[in-house]
């Protein structure tokens, strides 16, 4: 059976105060066309449907239109809520949607029942695992000892009976250890929300959401499809796409990606004011793109933002890179260091190196060690 795997639609998102709704509607039309071209037989949507727990009316209408068009194609749709979504709002009307072959993960209550579909190779079980926090699993199983995301997801999966003799597909929205991240994602401090890819060993394909760059983790069949659009300038080098996954006989999974072409790209450009405003500089590019411009002029250009927007109307961000800004940056960094104690600096270094903060015991040990060093000097 051939599926399209998409995730992290973030409908209603604003980037630097620019609404992305028009761009999202454009890319959704493209996705619908790809579904027809690729002869897709089912659609997997791995969470973060909306950008906010309480989406705007326009965002809800756009997703309603998208789902309605999918349902009109008589395709089964499988979707879960992500960390940006409201579980209760997204699950509203789930029983009614089933009649249109749209399967929505309910608010997590400890039960995850497979949805069985059939094709020429037999039965295929689809499991919908919505975004889980330790508190969600603890609420469903008060007796369980759960302190981490790893323990929460592991416990939730242990309550599922998986028949490994048939094909099994999982749709999930978590941060799997090893994923490359970018600025537009919301992750827990210190890597506390990491889970291991090995938790999904029983599944033939794991359709992941949460991470915005397309990538696989440890093996090709544990995959983040990425966002359909760029949502921050840390994503400028991403090649956005949809993932097409075909599960044939047990053990045979074929993966391809189909590129998505946005209405407006997100790009960075750099140069002097005269360079970036020269017609020869921009005449072969889309001036409607969302831009981050860095000017290298030594002197500030009066009303640079307004002037540049006469050429690049969707200029989102403007900054300078010159001798003055580099000196100021160096002074700021030195000033910050001078104001901090050796213990503060060591704590920052430890956090940077280990991606987690020091414990109270470690803090006390370093503090005592520093005091001893000062006494011996």
Where are these predicted regions, by residue range?
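A conserved active-site cap/scaffold subdomain adjacent to cofactor or substrate pockets
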Residues: 197, 204-262
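His/Asp/Glu-rich metal-coordinating catalytic cores
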Residues: 55, 84-218
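Accessory, non-catalytic peripheral segments of nucleic-acid enzymes
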Residues: 37, 42, 247-377
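A short helix->loop->beta-strand "cap" motif at the edges of active sites that frequently abuts
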Residues: 72-77, 166
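Glycine-rich phosphate-binding loop signature in dinucleotide/nucleotide-binding domains
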Residues: 35-39, 119-120, 162-165, 285-286
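N-terminal active-site segment of His-dependent metallophosphoesterases
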Residues: 1-68, 72, 363-372, 376
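Short beta-strand segments at enzyme active-site cores
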Residues: 41-47, 79-81, 167-171
């Amino acid at each position: 059976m051939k599926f399209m795997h998409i995730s992290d639609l973030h409908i209603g998102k604003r980037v630097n105060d620019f609404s992305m709704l028009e761009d999202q509607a454009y890319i959704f039309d493209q996705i619908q066309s790809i579904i027809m071209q690729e002869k897709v037989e089912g659609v997997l949507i791995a969470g973060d449907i909306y950008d906010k727990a309480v989406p705007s009316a326009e965002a809800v209408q756009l997703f309603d239109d998208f789902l309605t068009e999918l349902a009109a194609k008589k395709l089964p749709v499988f979707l879960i809520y992500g960390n940006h979504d409201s579980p209760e709002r997204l699950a509203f009307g789930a029983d009614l949607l089933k009649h249109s072959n749209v399967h929505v993960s309910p608010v997590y209550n400890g039960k995850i029942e497979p949805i069985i579909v059939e094709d020429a190779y037999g039965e295929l079980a689809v499991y919908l695992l919505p975004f889980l926090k330790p508190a969600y699993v603890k609420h469903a199983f008060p007796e369980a000892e759960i302190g981490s995301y790893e323990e929460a997801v592991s416990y939730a999966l242990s309550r599922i009976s998986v028949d490994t003799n048939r094909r099994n597909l999982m749709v999930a929205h978590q941060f799997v250890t090893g994923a490359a991240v970018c600025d537009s994602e919301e992750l827990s401090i210190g890597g506390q929300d990491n889970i291991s890819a090995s938790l999904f060993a029983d599944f033939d394909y794991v359709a992941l959401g949460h991470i915005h760059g397309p990538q696989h983790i440890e093996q090709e069949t544990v995959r983040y499809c990425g966002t359909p659009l760029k949502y921050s300038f840390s994503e400028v080098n991403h090649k956005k796409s949809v993932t097409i996954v075909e599960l044939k006989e047990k053990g045979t999974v074929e993966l391809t990606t189909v590129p998505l072409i946005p209405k407006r790209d997100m790009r960075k450009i750099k140069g002097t004011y005269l360079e970036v405003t020269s017609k020869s500089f921009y005449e072969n590019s889309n001036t409607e793109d969302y831009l981050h411009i860095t000017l290298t002029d030594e002197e500030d250009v009066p009303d640079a933002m307004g002037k540049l927007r006469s050429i690049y109307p969707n200029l989102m961000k403007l900054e300078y890179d010159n001798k003055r800004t580099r000196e100021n940056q160096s002074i700021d960094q030195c000033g910050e260091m001078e104001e901090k104690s050796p213990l503060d600096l060591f704590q920052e270094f430890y956090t940077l190196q280990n991606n987690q903060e020091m414990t109270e015991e470690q803090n006390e040990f370093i503090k005592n060690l520093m005091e001893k060093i000062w006494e011996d000097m």
